[in-house]
Structures are given as structure tokens and as C-alpha cells.
Amino acid sequence: REAVRSGILHGRDRILLLRGSEGGALLGYVSYRYLSATQLFGALRDTGLADRIRLRSAGTTLLITSAAADSSDPLRDCLQLLMTEVLARALSDDCIYGLYRPYGAPPEPDLEDLLTRQGFLCREGDPSLWEVDMSAPTVLIQNLETTIQEPLCQNHRLLAAIQRGHRRLQTALTQLYPRFLVLTLSAGVIHQRLLEMITAYNEVPAVPTESRKLGRNMCVPYGKMLRGKIVPNTVTKTIHTDRVYSPDLSQSSMEPFPHYPPIQSQIRTIKSFDRPVILVDDLMHPGFRIRALDPILRQEGVDIRIVLVGLLSGHGRDLMDAQGRPVDSVYYLPRLREWFVESTLYPFVGGNTIRRPASPVPGLLPGINHILPYASPSFRGECSEEAVFQLSRVCLESARDVISVLEQEYRALYGRSLTLSRLPEAIILPLCPDKGTCLNYDPTLAASVYLENDLEQLMRTHS
């Protein structure tokens, strides 16, 4: 401890603290600093290492020097939250290389596991030095727990299964682009900070008040983030949209979510409120939704005050500049190679809608998950076949494990089986993996049965 304290003071490190919401108890910390090319030797005290990092980084380097967090609650990963914040801040500050070199002993097993899941690699012969390339990160949005209905979403067995699957998924993603950073963003954290940003822009309290006083602006979520949610002291109205793919996945279009009016009618309803609008989405990178909505918003004369998103990339900022829209975000990443939303990788839990004349099971839309054996992932040409296979396998196995626990807990709670026809009682907006128009699902069977079959089909393709 004294070595850590002395090192932090001598190196003039920055310290990021994590405190509990009740009482402000300290839950963890990370110490770090930024290094320019000329500062590498002074921090590393190794000429060969400093030169190698200098050639690889070609810019600012993030140096993490110590980290520790409370691990008493296995369902609360405090260390992950801290590491995410440090890495995200470093990326927004244009750091393109990351190092972990602790003061004192090599990292504990928990921290070593965490570093591995972020894409850090241990330098050969030096267990106290870990490196990661931050120039083209992959982002994983952790949101699976937000897809489960109440009260099952608070079940400890289910949350533990979700966490196990999440950690396996992180590890699998590091193999797509070895040596490169995998940044995990919590949907819960994004949700809370978006609420704070919306109420701040609307100049109203971030918590409900007894005498309700509405702000001048209205909040309009147009993606999956905040869909169906109410923002404190703010008029909130969702534009219900859905990205729908053709059966061969060659085309996609923005359409109203099933059972909702046409998008233009929804926007006219927004216009009728006669308020400036705060548009809200989870991600602004390819900008598919905003590209489709922008012409209609302009045609109807909707006054857009600002666009708020959870994650904004450099490409997304350029798109907003081109459209002349002000934009702000919870996280800003100048460079983004690939992004994944956790729930869309889990069959029956999420995915993208497929255009079909009828639903395979009443209450379930036909969907596609961009993993094997359902589809060829868009990144397949850039990654090894083994990495793509292992990612698909992890997604199927984790989905099976999570849904199996969900089925058990549903039966214990309600005294009946969780079949496909009852899946909407346990999962918010579930999808059924599309099998074409000739194969039918049995609505009386469980989703885990079909996941076992799909896993067998995947294993047949692997030699």
C-alpha cells in the first residue's frame, strides 16, 4: 500500500474514485496518467520498452498504475465500471495505446482477468506489464438485464447467469481483433447519465418532484434507449421505429414498429406538442435511424434543440455536422472499429427484424442474429474463421444457459412452463430466429430446446 501511495504521489497520477449512491462509501479507485512520447522512458525506466511503445503508439499513451475495488457483491463489477470510465476518457482524449504497469506486485487474479477481457496482453517475461492497442476499439454495450421483464430481472440466479455469459462474450470478442481494445459500456450507466443530461438541458430536476413543473423542451427517444420510459419533469414521447431486413439481408429499411402508426404520423404528433425537441438514441455511428428520420423532421418543421446519444463516434459527429444538428453524448470515441449490442447477439432475446408475411409464433416477430449459423457476420472477412466460430458458439451457449435459468425461475414463480408462446411474459420484445417460410416453430416448446438444435447445427460446420 505504501508503494502505491508513494508511486501515485511521485508520478502525480490522476485518481478516479467510485462511490456508492447511498452514504458515499468508497467502492474502488483507479490511478492513471497520460504519457507523451518524450515521457515514456521516465515512466517505464526501460529504453528498449520505451522505444517500442513509442513506435507503436505514435501519440499519447494511457498508463494505468493501480486499481482496486470492492468485490463483496459478485453481481456488481465495480472494477469493470472503473476501468470502462478510465479507458473511455482516454479514448476521448485521443490516447491510442494503453499500458498497465502497477506500483509493486503484479495484478491480482481478478484484475488480471479483467485486463484480459478488455483485450490487454501480458508482455512476455514481465507479468507486471500489460499492453493494448486503443487505435481502433471494439465496443460492447452490456444491456441483457434490461431485456428481462419484472420481477425476473431482479432474480439473482438469472443475473449470475447473465454475468457469466457476459464475461465469456467479452473474452470471445478479444479474439476477433487480438491486441486491440474491447470497451464495455453499461446500458444502465448510459441510461442514468442520459436522464441527467436531458433534465439538465431542459433545466428541470433530475428526480420527480411533488409539484410537477415541466420543462420547455420535450424528450423524443427514437431508438431502443429510453423506449417507453418517462423522463422526470419532461414531456416524453417515443418515435417507435424498427430496422427491418429483407429475407436475404441484402437490404434494410426504417419502418414503424409493429402496431404503431406510420413514422410520418408519429412525427406529426410530435410536432403538435409545439415544443423544442431533444432527440435521444443509444448510438450514433452509422446513423441509420437519423438519416431516415431527418428528411421527415425537416419536412414537418420539428424544432430540434439537440441530439443526445449514449455513444458518439467521430463518424457520427461528422454526420451531425453535415446535417447541421447539435449533438452531445455520454461517451465520445473518435475512432470506432466495430460495435455490438449484447442482446442482439442472443437468439430469442434480441436481434433485427426480418420482413415476413406472418409471425412464426403469435407474439414473436421473425428476427436475425448476425452470428453463425443464422447469418454470415459483416466482420467475417477481417477476422479469423476460428474467432468468428467461437464468438457464435459463445453467444448460442450463453443464450441457452440464460434462457434455461429463466425457464426454471419462471416455472418456480408462476407454476407453469415458459414456452415460446409465453416468452413475451419473461422477455421484453423477444424475437424468433427466422427459419424461412417452410419450417414452423412449435409454440408449446421451450426456446432452450431450439437453441440446443441451433448449437448442434453450428458444431456440424466446424472441423
Question: What are these model-derived regions, one by one?
Answer:
Residues 22-30, 59-62:
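Glycine-rich phosphate/pyrophosphate-binding loop shared by adenosine-nucleotide-utilizing enzymes
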